[in-house]
Design a protein with these regions (language model features):
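Selective recognition of specific alpha-helical transmembrane segments in multi-pass small-molecule
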Residues: 51, 55, 59-60, 159-172, ...
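Hydrophobic, small-residue-rich membrane helices and short re-entrant helix-turn-helix hairpins
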Residues: 144-155, 193-196, 216-245, 263-275, ...
Length: 454
């Protein structure tokens, strides 16, 4: 019996779905800013960024299919039922009201409103007013899901990509400086690969892939593919198409960001950099189109995230707290967080991402290695113990200095720096994760040994 697989046309359609899930206008702020920081060391920065911003997210989606899971809670539940609930909540809050949703509003404000304000304008007040209107629309459409997100997806997203292509082409044809002539900032001078690897965390796409992988799998199933192995294979092959497009966009963005240093000083964040580049090459009309398309693209992303988070938490509470209540709560909370500003949101998100990304990556890798240990829970638990224990130190290290001082974290951070390999690269969790995995495999092997007969 022949197992049905997707045709090339169907794979392209799935790739489009994946691209729509992963790539939002907010993603562009990271590669452009990365290019400005990396300068002449753009190549190793590109490689590092693509690993965590493209490769891991695609594997995250495929992990749901490989393990035949029906969602993130089922996959993370292989560690334990309680852990599955905990990790699902933490992940959705991170890509929801804590960081990703507020970031959408602030990216729109930074690229659309800030360039219009005078030097003495009360920016905080305008951010408050803008975010109030932005989240009023988010709540309205989250409570009344309909064709608005389809309209934005079919019209605004392609318009944005077209505009972005024109902007990037204009920048590449008339670069502000040669990439080789741009001095990198201190953090990227001696080693650009590892900082860029961590910079890719900011896209939050790896954890988003775990959260929304089931959506893509359902799309494939509706196309008539019902074999789990075939589904996983189709996700991977479609993901390669998506990854190639995302990688191309990121490479161009990083190069243009580096070249822009010949025109501008290092910007505070990528939103400001993108606005400066658009204004220089395309003038006032370019700024207007950038603001219009990014605002609507971020609006669509916010509506989708509020909807996904509200549905997930409503299901987890068995409907005792309604979808409507969760949607209102998440929208109001996101509105409040958005008013700390884009740079602050990015800064405060780093410690959380340093905490949640290591176990997310470990979970993805365990999903693919699971066939070698029959997805034994012991291996999952042992790996996660090592990963979480070390990730906590990585999180401590990236907390703002006043917080480190207030919590007296100097001693534990110094301990980790002395005993964890790669801790200086923000990858101190790698060796403990490997040790945990090895310990889990050893425990499993010892359990399988048959006692000798006498």
């Amino acid at each position: 019996m022949t197992t049905k697989k997707l045709t090339l046309r169907q794979k392209i359609l799935v790739a489009g779905t994946l691209f729509g899930m992963f790539f939002g206008a907010g993603n562009l702020i990271f590669p452009v800013h990365l290019g400005q920081m990396a300068g002449q060391n753009a190549l190793p920065a590109i490689i590092g960024f693509i690993i965590t911003a493209v490769g891991i997210p695609i594997l995250g989606v495929a992990a749901i299919g490989v393990t035949h899971s029906d969602g993130l809670q089922t996959l993370s539940g292989k560690v334990g039922k309680g852990y599955g609930i905990f990790f699902t909540c933490l992940l959705y809050l991170t890509i929801g009201p804590l960081f990703a949703i507020p970031r959408c509003a602030t990216v729109s404000f930074t690229t659309g409103i800030t360039p219009l304000l005078g030097a003495d304008s009360p920016e905080r007040l305008y951010l408050l007013l803008f975010s109030a209107v932005f989240f009023a629309f988010v709540l309205f459409f989250s409570l009344r899901p309909g064709k608005i997100t389809v309209w934005i997806g079919k019209i605004i997203n392609p318009l944005f990509l077209f505009f972005f292509a024109v902007l990037m082409l204009a920048a590449l044809l008339a670069p502000g400086a040669a990439v080789s002539a741009v001095e990198p900032v201190e953090a990227y001078r001696s080693d650009a690969f590892f900082p860029a690897l961590i910079e890719g965390y900011g896209t939050m796409d790896a954890i988003a892939g775990l959260a929304f992988g089931i959506v893509v799998i359902d799309v494939i199933r509706r196309m008539g593919v019902d074999n789990d192995d075939a589904i996983a294979e189709d996700v991977l092959s479609s993901g390669l198409l998506t990854g190639a497009l995302m990688a191309l966009i990121y490479v161009v963005s990083i190069v243009v960001g580096a070249q822009s240093r010949g025109l501008f000083e290092l910007s505070e964040n990528g939103g400001i950099a993108l606005t400066q580049i658009a204004g220089h090459y395309l003038g006032g009309v370019g700024l207007f189109i950038l603001a219009f398309t990014i605002t609507f693209a971020c609006l669509k992303t916010s509506i989708g995230l509020v909807t996904a988070c509200a549905e997930t938490f409503s299901k987890m509470t068995n409907g005792k707290i309604s979808y409507r209540s969760w949607a209102i709560l998440f929208t109001v909370f996101s509105f409040a967080v958005s008013n700390i500003g884009l740079s602050a949101i990015i800064e405060y998100s780093i410690p959380m991402l340093m905490l949640i990304y290591p176990p997310a990556i470990a979970l993805i890798l365990l999903a693919f290695l699971g066939k070698f240990f029959a997805h034994d829970r012991t291996v999952y638990i042992a790996t996660m113990i090592g990963t979480w224990a070390a990730a906590i130190f990585d999180c401590m290290k990236t907390l703002p200095a006043p917080v480190q001082t207030a919590l007296h974290l100097d001693a534990p951070i110094a301990f980790a720096a002395a005993h964890l390999p790669l801790f200086d690269k923000n990858l101190g969790w790698l060796l403990p994760a490997v040790i945990g995995f090895a310990a889990g495999m050893a425990i499993r092997a010892s359990r399988r040994q048959t006692p000798a007969s006498f």
